[in-house]
């Protein structure tokens, strides 16, 4: 697996599991993917392996072409350090209701001034969402990805480079630490 360095004292660290971009971002896929992973294969940010156990769930929504879908996000707890961690998929952006691929499409569409194509393909996304994403991109991410020469057009590369360079998912705004696991199944 691939992880980035995170302080062992980070209690709010998220754990992100890599999924290929062609997988659907639906509650059914999230639940299916989680059912296929072995929690003992994941290591806690404190450094211990085999110590994560299901602690609970919380609800979060993602805006999709099918509407605003509710997800039950898994939280795990480390028996060694006692910290809890949310388990997300790499197609999700922490603290956002808009998927990573939709956010990248909005950023790319802004270059051609054609945001209507994104809003047409996902009617749950409106102009206000687009403005918010573009403002956050310009404020928090544009210079960062330019400085590391990270292209937007290759999703797997974008994800892995942002975790390697910044210990965050692309477009994650809050500075909560986040680690990426590859090849979890």
Question: Across the structure, where does each feature detected by a protein language model lie?
Answer:
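Short, conserved DNA-binding cores of transcription-related domains
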Residues: 1-92
